[in-house]
């Protein structure tokens, strides 16, 4: 299975294009890195691939077909700031159940403690919230995971643990991963191949 973006263009006006004629392809089981400076359109491209942006040029497809806007999205996007992806009025146990029932194995893999489940989002740290976001995203119907600077808020040891768990789970489930980061050393450790926004988008 392939997630493809073809001739992707995006901008708030014709004289200020953030993306122009960008092509990207990610296969099942691939771990692909995406590197670029701030302002080069990395996050915008992620949002387009995951269906968050609608007013773009070009085509996004899953094995040649348009991704349905209803039901569970097989392309899951994890944001740099997880607090933006949770409902502050829900307890964490309810947030986890939003898309599917998360297995105990995945909860344990990400070190999610049982007493965290009855807390509100504002009672957890950014790193703890990110663990919930990852557990929720790695559902049985997920085919691709887009990770946009997801471990910038944690220390190096925690970063290594989180990525070790992600890579183990996605390998088992044959999920393709797009790892977006400005940290080239992290990208080189994790990824099978690397794309540079300077090559894709000329910036």
Language model features with spans:
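Helix-to-loop junction immediately C-terminal to a conserved catalytic motif
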Residues: 50
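The feature captures the beta-strand-to-loop junction immediately N-terminal to the Walker
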Residues: 35-37
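A short, flexible loop at the N-terminus of ABC-type nucleotide-binding domains that lies
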Residues: 1-5, 9-21, 28
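Conserved ABC transporter NBD signature motif
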Residues: 57-71
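Conserved ABC ATPase signature
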Residues: 120-124, 128
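Q-loop/switch helix immediately C-terminal to the Walker
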Residues: 81, 88-102
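Hydrophobic anchor residue at the start of the ABC signature
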Residues: 134, 146
């Amino acid at each position: 299975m392939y997630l493809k973006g073809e001739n992707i263009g995006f901008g708030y006006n014709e004289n200020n294009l953030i993306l122009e004629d960008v092509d990207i392809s990610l296969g099942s089981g691939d771990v692909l890195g995406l590197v670029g400076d701030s302002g080069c359109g990395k996050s915008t491209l992620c949002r387009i691939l995951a269906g968050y942006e609608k007013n773009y040029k070009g085509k996004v497809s899953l094995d040649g077909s348009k991704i349905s806007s209803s039901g569970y999205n097989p392309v899951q996007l994890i944001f740099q700031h997880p607090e933006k992806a949770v409902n502050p009025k829900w307890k964490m146990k309810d947030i986890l159940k939003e898309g599917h029932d998360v297995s105990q194995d995945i909860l344990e893999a990400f070190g999610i403690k049982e007493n965290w489940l009855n807390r509100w989002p504002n009672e957890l740290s950014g790193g703890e919230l990110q663990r919930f976001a990852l557990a929720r995203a790695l559902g049985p119907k997920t085919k691709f995971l887009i990770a946009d600077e997801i471990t910038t808020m944690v220390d190096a040891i925690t970063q290594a643990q989180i990525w070790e768990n992600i890579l183990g789970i996605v390998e088992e489930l044959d999920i393709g991963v797009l790892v977006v980061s400005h940290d080239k050393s992290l990208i080189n450790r994790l990824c099978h191949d690397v794309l540079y926004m300077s090559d894709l988008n000329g910036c």
